Swiss-Prot record:
Potential cancer-testis antigen, with expression restricted to the testis and certain malignant cells. Expressed in numerous tissues; not found in breast, heart, small intestine and liver. Isoform 1: Predominantly expressed in the testis. Isoform 3: Predominantly expressed in the testis, at lower level in the placenta, during malignant progression of melanocytic tumors and in several tumors of varying origins. Isoform 4: Predominantly expressed in the testis, at lower level in the placenta, during malignant progression of melanocytic tumors and in several tumors of varying origins. Isoform 5: Predominantly expressed in the testis. Isoform 6: Predominantly expressed in the testis. The gene is DSCR8. It comes from Homo sapiens. The lineage of its organism: Eukaryota, Metazoa, Chordata, Craniata, Vertebrata. It comes from the Eukaryota. This is Down syndrome critical region protein 8.
Length: 97
């Protein structure tokens, strides 16, 4: 007598679990990571997956607005990246030169 194979519900649940785990790991990979030293300091560096692209080209070529007015005094450059059009707000990211 032939062994019955896995039923459709079991296979479907397993596939759903695999998809959810894959999406979770993908989101964790793409999410920004905040790296700090062990002590409490006033400086942390934000590492984004697209940081190499942003730093390799001038912001004007990428369509980003820069605020260079206070760069000499603060030693930082601010980039304003538009969020999706649904929110219509701006997100500020600072890079140390």
């Amino acid at each position: 007598m032939k062994e019955p194979g896995p039923n459709f519900v079991t296979v479907r649940k397993g596939l759903h679990s695999f998809k959810m785990a894959f999406v979770k790991h993908l989101l964790l990979f793409l999410s920004p990571r905040l790296e700090c030293s062990g002590s409490i300091t006033d400086h942390c560096s934000l590492h984004l997956p697209v940081q190499e692209i942003l730093m390799s080209q001038p912001p004007e070529q990428l369509g980003l607005q820069t605020n260079l007015g206070n760069q000499e005094s603060s030693g930082m450059m601010k980039l304003f990246m538009p969020r999706p059009k649904v929110l219509a707000q701006y997100e500020s990211i600072q890079f140390m030169p």
